[in-house]
Structure formats: C-alpha cells, structure tokens
Regions:
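Conserved phosphate/anionic-ligand binding catalytic regions in large, soluble enzymes, centered on
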Residues: 51-62, 138-157, 221-246, 288-308, ...
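Terminal amphipathic helices with adjacent charged low-complexity linkers/tails
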Residues: 153-188, 363-392, 400, 436
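Glycine/proline-enriched, intrinsically flexible loops and inter-domain linkers
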Residues: 6, 24, 165-265
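A glycine-rich phosphate-binding loop feature that marks nucleotide/adenosyl-phosphate handling sites
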Residues: 7-12, 79, 168-181, 231-239, ...
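Noncatalytic alpha-helical scaffolds and linker/capping helices
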Residues: 10, 377-437
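Phosphate-backbone binding interfaces of nucleic-acid-interacting proteins
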Residues: 1-177, 312, 328-331, 335, ...
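Conserved mixed alpha/beta core segments that line enzyme active sites in large multi-domain catalysts
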Residues: 2, 18-46, 117, 214-215, ...
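Conserved catalytic alpha/beta cores of large enzymes that bind or transform nucleotide phosphates
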Residues: 96-97, 102-105, 112-114, 170, ...
Length: 437
C-alpha cells in the first residue's frame, strides 16, 4: 500500500463564492477581473477569470489558494499569480476542473440561493470514503483491479488466522432477452487474439451515469463520459478485464473481423489522429473497415454517442506482445493497453462481459439481443502445473517456513495442491497468475 487518503482531493479548498464585481481585464480581450465574496468574513478576493460566461451576481465554485486540483494522474496547486499584470488569488472553476462533470464551456454557475462560503463537498453531497493507493509491481498483472487486490488481501488475512470470505457478485441474472441483433465474429489472426467475446444490447439510452457510478470513477481518477462508457471503465477497474463498446449501427455487415491490414494503411483514432498502420497492428474491423486498434484505442466514429441506441460490448484476450508493440508504435498508453500488455486473466472475459451487460440493462434500459459469441484459440492459456520444493522456499525467504503454513498460504492464493511428498508440492496455478513460472 503506497498511500491512503480520503476521496481524491475530497474537494478540499473549494467553496461557494459570489461574484461581486466583474470588469474587463485592462490588457486582455477575453479575461475578466472579478472580486468574489468567499463567505469567510474577509475582504472580497480578486480573481482573474478567462471564462466567457462569468458575470457579477453569480454563485460559483472557487478554488482557494493552496487547493490541489486533479487532471487524471496529474495534480496542480492553486497559487497566487499575475495574469497580464493583474494579481489573482484563486480560480473560478468549470465542472471538469474539479472532477464533477465533463463541462468546460465556461464556469459552473450555481443556483442563486446557494449559501456563500459553503464547502463544495457539502454542496455536491460528497460522501466520506477512503481511497487506498496500491503500488503494483510490473509482474503482478493479476492485481491491476479491485478484485485482484482483494484476492491478495484475503490471502493475507487467512494467513494471519482471521476468518475471512472472498465474494464476487454472481452473474446468474444474465439472460438473453431476444435475438434481434446477432453479430458474427471471425478471427483471422488467432496468434494475436486468443479469445474474443461479444454481446449486443438493443434500445439503450445513452445518458449521464447515476451519481454513485460517477463518484466511483471520479474517486479513482477517471472522468465520467456516459453510462455505457462508464460501465466499461467500472468493470475494468473492478475485475481487471478491459472492455470496449461499439455503436452496433457502425458494424457494417453484422460482422466483427479481427485482423491486420496492409502496411501503410491509414486509420483515424478517437483522438482525431490519422495513423499509419503497420501490418503488425491488430485491428477490430467490421465487414468494410477498421473500427479499433485492438486493446489500445478505438476509432473515430465507432464509439457510443447521444444518438446511439444499440451497442456491442467486446471482451477479449489480446496477446500482450502485440498490444505492447502497437501501443509503442503509435505512442499510445491507455488503461486498457496497460492491462493487456501485462496479461489479463484468460478466463475472465465472459464474467466481465456479463457484468457489463447486466449493468447496461440497469442503467441504460437496453435488452440483451444475442447469445454471447465466444471464439477461442486452442493456444489460449489455461491453468498450469508447477513443482515447488520446500527447500527452495526456505532458501528464497531466508528462513525455514512450516510446511502447513506454506500450504495455507498457497491455498489462500488460489493454488490447488495436486499432490505432495516429503520434498514439496505439485501445484495447479490459475491462468491469471502470469508471474508464476
């Protein structure tokens, strides 16, 4: 555990202020010089603001001096500054600057009856929570999720004699509602895509996620987008399996093809960049064109938008080497590629897909419109056996460990004891433990 803190930033240092005056900046055609009452009994605070919609009389959210604001993994501190020769002692904030929404078309303007001086955490009804930041070593891909960390915590508690249960929500509620939107899957490069699962939902309403889901994502440094995209991020962080969602109307020919394209082909990604492809870039395509660089980043136009009604969820196992090389080739690093590069659980695709579909039914009102397609390569890694000698354990750790304690720890870590003799154990290791050899 690297750090334990309250919910990311906890909106600490952010308060409701009232803009008393608002004048055009003497040396800028787009900035304004404001004075703001922060409700602290002191003189009004001078703040230079670049938002086009700031005006006298507004109730706004103000980041006071010393406040930390976050943008993903980055943080910056509000300091006294001088903008075009005018001193500024704080910042009037937009939604996205404090992590409560996506809006950046001007500052947030609050209702007129909002009390001046009210902490932003109170205004947004921010519930108390704790964020535990865990430093994951590069070889522990299995721990890149809440479920993965929970497995290790469970083993630790069991080893220390604390009665503990490990529970993962079941997926028994998953059921196909109709067969109105079938999509076929074809894998042309099975050495690069060892498993591809997909399911469609019809009649979804794309909208903001409920407050509980937005707050979960904001807490861990992710920005809410819409209910469908947020579901994929939530499931990935919870269980370690990256997902991708497509607008089903964009899947020409009703078919997903996992393949490569000729060297030099072009593709425009979600960030608007036109990229020249290698013939070693694995792509998720429809019957006519590419839609996504597998495991790395989606294509422009193939995602979900306000007008989307039918979606396809993808849950796959892409070979770590292929994803790593594509990500580096294009200078991209995403939460999905981070996990695929290190190796996700080869048995985790169906569970994650079902959880996403169930959440989509709950939050977007869709109906599951096909049987899950699950295409696997014979080379897909399953559980495997290793031999462990007690003497090796003693030498590695530097002291002798009782055999019964070794067995307890290994069993708690989901290692199955196949056989045992006086020298050691034969173990069956779950496929998700890519660090075990």
């Amino acid at each position: 555990v690297e750090e334990v803190q309250t919910i990311r930033g906890g909106l600490k240092g952010l308060v409701v202020g009232k803009v008393l005056t608002c004048e055009v900046h003497p040396d800028s055609d787009h900035m304004h010089v404001t004075t703001v009452d922060l409700g602290d009994g002191n003189e009004p605070t001078q703040i230079v603001c670049g938002a086009h919609n700031v005006a006298a009389g507004q109730k706004v959210i103000v980041a006071t001096l010393g406040t930390k604001l976050y943008d993903g993994d980055k943080e910056f501190v509000i300091k006294k500054s001088k903008l075009r020769g005018v001193e500024s002692y704080g910042m009037i904030c937009a939604e996205d600057e404090i992590g409560v929404g996506n809006g950046h078309d001007g500052i947030m303007v609050l209702p007129e009856d909002t009390p001046v001086g009210m902490p932003a955490a109170t205004y947004f009804n921010l519930e108390s929570d704790w964020l535990i930041e865990v430093d994951i070593t590069p070889n522990r891909a299995d721990a890149c999720s809440h479920w993965g960390v929970a497995r290790d915590l469970y083993a630790y508690l069991v080893r220390n004699g604390i009665k503990t249960t490990l529970h993962r929500p079941d997926d028994k509620a998953f059921a196909v509602d109709n067969h109105e939107l079938p999509v076929a899957v074809e894998i042309e490069r099975p050495e690069a895509c060892l498993r591809y699962c997909a399911v469609t939902l019809k009649g979804c309403e794309i909208k903001e996620s409920p407050k509980w889901l937005q707050e979960k994502l904001i807490t861990i440094g992710l920005r809410p987008i819409n209910n469908i995209v947020d579901i994929t991020n939530y499931v990935m962080m919870a269980y370690g399996q990256p997902l991708h969602c497509f607008d089903a109307d964009m899947i020409a020919g009703g078919k997903i093809v996992v393949k490569t394209l000729p060297e030099g082909s072009s593709f425009v990604t979600l960030d608007g960049e036109k990229r020249e492809l290698s013939d070693r870039d694995l792509l998720i395509c429809n019957a006519e064109e590419p839609m996504c660089i597998a495991g790395v980043l989606g294509g422009k136009g193939s995602g979900t938008y306000d007008t989307t009604r039918d979606v396809l969820f993808e849950s796959a196992y892409f070979h770590p080497t292929w994803v790593r090389k594509s990500a580096r080739r294009h200078g991209l690093s995403t939460d999905a590629s981070f996990r695929f590069e290190r190796g996700v659980d080869p048995d985790g695709q169906l569970y994650a897909l079902k959880q996403a579909a169930l959440l989509a039914k709950e939050l977007a009102g869709g109906e599951i419109a096909m049987e899950i397609v699950d295409v696997q390569s014979p080379e897909l890694k399953k559980s495997f056996d290793v031999e462990l000698e007690y003497q090796y354990v003693h030498e590695l750790i530097g002291k002798e460990i009782p055999h019964d304690l070794i067995r307890t720890i290994l069993t708690a870590l989901d290692m199955q004891i196949v056989s045992e003799n006086e020298k050691g154990l034969s173990l069956r290791v779950p496929a998700y433990r890519v660090d075990v050899q």
